[in-house]
């Protein structure tokens, strides 16, 4: 593993550990660096800010892994994605509750919209309202996923995706 990834993983582990006891909004870059005995210079060499670190965690732990798989349907992809969130719900409950510029919610929305755009184009073709459909379903999925994960009695991922499928 290149040194760069070792450093990034150490910063990621520090952030995850801090988020077990502190809300994301109360964690500073200095806190993250202190937790893994690194300089702020090292942090900023690899990441723009703590939001960028969260997005990197999601990309390396989830998106990159899912890209390697061949899914028969979009539902299979959604099931794996939700299973990942369910298995890491402590971390993502805290990150999904933060909104705004550079937030994980914004990053996640962009990824979901990209995936749905491909599926929607297969369904609707070059319909002039394709962008509307993509936005609608992206927002619906994001709202449902956030509500599901933030529920203190979060149901298992398979049950959740089954209910989503029934809705559509």
Where do the model's predicted regions map?
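Short helix-capping/hinge SLiMs at alpha-helix to coil transitions
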Residues: 21-24, 151
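Hydrophobic alpha-helical segments that form the core
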Residues: 128-151, 155-168
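Basic/polar phosphate-binding segments, predominantly the helix-turn-helix DNA-binding elements
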Residues: 4, 32-52, 84-87, 91-95, ...
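An amphipathic alpha-helix adjacent to DNA-recognition modules
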Residues: 8-16, 25-29, 34-37, 44-71, ...
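Secondary-structure edge/capping motif, primarily at the C-terminal ends of alpha-helices
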Residues: 69, 92-95, 148, 152
């Amino acid at each position: 593993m290149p040194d760069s990834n070792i450093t990034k993983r150490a910063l990621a582990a520090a952030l995850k550990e801090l988020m077990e006891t502190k809300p994301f909004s109360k964690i500073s870059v200095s806190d993250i660096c202190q937790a893994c005995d690194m300089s702020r210079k090292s942090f900023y060499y690899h990441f723009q800010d703590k939001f960028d670190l969260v997005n990197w965690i999601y990309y390396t732990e989830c998106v990159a892994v899912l890209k390697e798989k061949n899914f028969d349907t979009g539902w299979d992809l959604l099931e794996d994605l939700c299973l990942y969130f369910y298995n890491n719900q402590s971390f993502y409950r805290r990150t999904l509750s933060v909104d705004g510029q550079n937030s994980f919610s914004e990053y996640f929305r962009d990824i979901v919209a990209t995936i749905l755009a491909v599926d929607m184009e297969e369904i609707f073709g070059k319909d002039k309202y394709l962008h509307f459909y993509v936005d609608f379903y992206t927002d619906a999925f994001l709202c449902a996923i956030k509500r599901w994960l933030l529920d203190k009695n979060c149901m298992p991922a398979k049950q959740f995706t089954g209910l989503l499928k029934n809705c559509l």
